[in-house]
């Protein structure tokens, strides 16, 4: 069957699929637009099924923050190659998915995939269709949402969109600029907790065990080993606890000192590095 360029363009605009694939779909369905859309979705699912066992360890980390700053979402979406991670359609999908997560705060990935993407299409359906168009395995790996009635959610995404951070900031100071500094600190230095009290007991105990074993192996006197262990634990806190880290923009002060001067505090943070 002969199909017009107008029909092909309409199907292309509706699905984003390549012109030749749209033409073939219309020919196979005798020019029926709805049937052609359904056929293209089916082919997209076939591609997704074929690629299911393939590793997808490239992708993007994206964030979205509400207009009032009281909520933020962070999402990691994976693909097979960095080339696709730079694809405009893939990036647009990732940004839209983050916006939907922010709006709907789903409980899990299954609920996220059931959210509306646009019109009558769900996020899962759009992901399958995009898989068909791009030809790579695409997956939504994880997401998180921070909400705060009193605080501000500040986001930072490192250039390249492989690393992103959300930080919840409280206080009367200038939250936007300082919060971004803190988010960049979290991105760069990978703290595991805001304060030392939040470090899990098993982590502290493991650090003590490692320090004690090292001291014994070095032949340190028994009566000084406890002090050595606690000293190394203090240094561990300085390296891995946000409030005790040296501020990256001024290493002469700690992050806590910087925040105190700014009349701000940090309640929590979320850090996503691609593939972690």
Curated annotation (Swiss-Prot):
GO cellular component: cytoplasm
S-S pairs: none
Annotated region (Involved in Mg(2+) ion dislocation from EF-Tu), positions in chain: 81-84
Keywords: Cytoplasm, Elongation factor, Protein biosynthesis
Single GO molecular function: translation elongation factor activity
Subcellular localization(s) per the UniProt record: Cytoplasm
Family matches, as HAMAP family: EF_Ts
Role according to the record: Associates with the EF-Tu.GDP complex and induces the exchange of GDP to GTP. It remains bound to the aminoacyl-tRNA.EF-Tu.GTP complex up to the GTP hydrolysis stage on the ribosome.
Recorded family membership: Belongs to the EF-Ts family.
Protein name as annotated: Elongation factor Ts
Organism: Salinibacter ruber (strain DSM 13855 / M31)
Gene responsible for this protein: tsf
């Amino acid at each position: 069957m002969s199909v017009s360029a107008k029909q092909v363009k309409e199907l292309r605009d509706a699905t984003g699929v390549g012109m030749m694939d749209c033409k073939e779909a219309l020919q196979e369905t005798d020019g029926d637009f709805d049937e052609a859309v359904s056929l293209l979705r089916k082919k997209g699912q076939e591609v997704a099924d074929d690629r299911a066992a393939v590793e997808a360890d490239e992708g993007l980390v994206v964030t979205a923050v509400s207009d009032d700053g009281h909520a933020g979402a962070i999402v990691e979406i994976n693909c097979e190659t960095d080339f696709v991670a730079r694809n405009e359609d893939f990036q647009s999908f990732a940004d839209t998915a983050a916006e939907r997560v922010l709006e709907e705060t789903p409980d899990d990935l299954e609920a996220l995939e059931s959210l509306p993407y646009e019109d009558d299409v769900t996020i899962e359906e759009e992901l399958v269709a995009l898989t068909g168009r791009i030809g790579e395995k695409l997956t939504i790996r994880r997401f998180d949402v921070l909400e705060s009635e009193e605080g501000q959610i500040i986001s930072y995404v490192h250039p390249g969109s492989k690393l992103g951070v959300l930080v919840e900031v409280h206080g009367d100071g200038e939250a936007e600029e300082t919060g971004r500094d803190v988010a960049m600190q979290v991105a760069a230095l990978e703290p595991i907790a805001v304060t030392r009290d939040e470090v899990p007991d098993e982590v502290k105990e493991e650090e003590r065990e490692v320090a004690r074993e090292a001291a014994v192996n070095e032949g340190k006197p028994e009566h000084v080993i406890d002090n050595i262990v606690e000293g190394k634990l203090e240094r561990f806190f300085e390296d891995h606890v946000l409030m005790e880290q040296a501020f990256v923009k001024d290493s002469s002060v700690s992050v806590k000192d910087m925040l105190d001067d700014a009349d701000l505090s940090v309640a929590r943070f979320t850090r996503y590095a691609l593939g972690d």
